[in-house]
Swiss-Prot record:
Record protein name field: tRNA dimethylallyltransferase
Keywords carried by this UniProt record: ATP-binding, Magnesium, Nucleotide-binding, Transferase, tRNA processing
Subunit-structure text: Monomer.
UniProt xrefs under PANTHER family: TRNA DIMETHYLALLYLTRANSFERASE
Organism placement in taxonomy: Bacteria, Bacillati, Actinomycetota, Actinomycetes, Micromonosporales
Region: Interaction with substrate tRNA, residue numbers: 74-77
Catalysed reactions listed for this entry: adenosine(37) in tRNA + dimethylallyl diphosphate = N(6)-dimethylallyladenosine(37) in tRNA + diphosphate
Region feature (Disordered): 1-30
Keyword set includes tRNA processing: yes
Function recorded in the entry: Catalyzes the transfer of a dimethylallyl group onto the adenine at position 37 in tRNAs that read codons beginning with uridine, leading to the formation of N6-(dimethylallyl)adenosine (i(6)A).
HAMAP family in the cross-refs: IPP_trans
Binding positions (substrate): 51-56
Length: 342
């Protein structure tokens, strides 16, 4: 389950990304012209929505129906070895559907939305060039928008960043979050008060650009022809599904997986260490929580995260929302895709 919030900050795009891991994404640039046909040819299909709502299952069904390939848009499934806690589909569960941008970074690599954008667009362009349909699938809202929309990333200033990080280390995130709330209430509402790294980035962008951080979010003008299908459930059944999912993760070995990743530097990973489930287990391993407390806090934190995901996605009127509990989910999703592709 991704804990990189739905409005994660734009990061600098200069960091090198390892070439290995997962399924290779061919290099490329620009938007390729589709070489083949199909009813959704030339259209990027995004499957979005909150954690545990059923995005992965729907994406597999759509990929089979549309001759598609999945491009991951879950910020934590980018990390190698973070499998159980992110509900990453196994090879068998992918049912032969090619998946791109899984397992590309070590857990010590800080997230970069700019690097993700570059890699994801290369994957999308390659899929389109082969006449197939790209399915952009995940609950990391900014990652989805950074691919689908025209989005230039603000620069960085090492001196400004260092000064803000020094303030964070000395005073903690609360006064910085209060400053952000005064300068940009919308940004403050989307960033948790304890998430110092994202608060620092937002304040840095405001200082460098003289504009609200939210002004740096994607321009809604499209980069690709696309359709966004959102899947969701009523709160009560989704809350129950989250609890069952966390129970299953514990049974499947989340503690052992986290312990193995801790040996690879997970606790020092600025992004990966904040992933839901993993951060709670790390606290258990450090003696800060009992295992029962870590388990229950994972459920509570995931439910809170789902509320923020909903708030992010529901602001976008272009998303066609579907009830993932409905018996006609796949047929309804295909109708939405076909209508947009006409």
């Amino acid at each position: 389950m991704s804990a990189n919030g739905p409005a994660a900050e734009p990061a600098d795009g200069g960091r090198a990304v390892p070439a290995g891991g997962g399924e290779a994404v061919p290099a490329g640039g620009g938007r390729a012209v589709p070489a083949g046909g199909g009813e959704a040819a030339g259209t990027v299909v995004a499957v979005v929505g909150p954690t545990a709502a059923g995005k992965s299952a729907l994406s597999i069904a759509l990929a089979h129906a549309l001759d598609g390939e999945v491009v991951n848009a879950d910020s934590m499934q980018l990390y190698r070895g973070m499998d159980i806690g992110t509900a990453k589909l196994t090879t068998g569960e992918r049912e032969g559907v090619p998946h791109h941008l899984l397992d590309i970074w070590p857990v010590t690599e800080p997230a970069s939305v700019a690097e993700y954008q570059r890699l994801a667009r290369a994957a999308v362009d390659d899929i389109l060039a082969r006449g197939r349909v790209p399915l952009l699938v995940g609950g990391s809202g900014l990652y989805v928008r950074a691919v689908l929309e025209r989005f230039e990333f603000p620069g960085t200033d090492p001196a400004v960043r260092a000064r803000l990080e020094a303030e964070l280390a000395q005073a903690g995130p609360a006064p910085l979050h209060a400053r952000l709330r005064a300068a940009d209430p919308d940004a403050a509402a989307s960033i948790l008060p304890g998430n110092g790294r994202r608060i620092v980035r937002a304040l840095e962008v405001i200082e460098l650009t003289g504009a609200p951080f939210t002004a740096a979010l994607p321009d809604p003008s499209p980069y690709y022809r696309s359709v966004q299908v959102g899947v969701d459930l009523d709160t009560a059944p989704l809350d129950e599904r989250i609890a069952l999912r966390v129970d299953r993760m514990w049974a499947d070995g989340l503690v052992a997986e986290t312990r193995a990743l801790a040996a690879q530097g997970l606790a020092g990973g600025r992004t990966a260490s904040r992933a839901l489930g993993y951060q709670q287990v790390l606290r258990f391993l450090a003696g800060e929580l009992t295992e029962t407390e870590a388990h229950q806090e994972t459920i509570r934190a995931t439910r809170r995260f789902v509320r923020r995901q909903r708030s992010w996605f529901r602001r976008d009127p272009r998303i066609a929302w579907l009830d993932s509990a409905g018996s006609g989910l796949v047929a309804d999703a295909l109708r939405a895709v076909r209508a947009a592709a006409r």
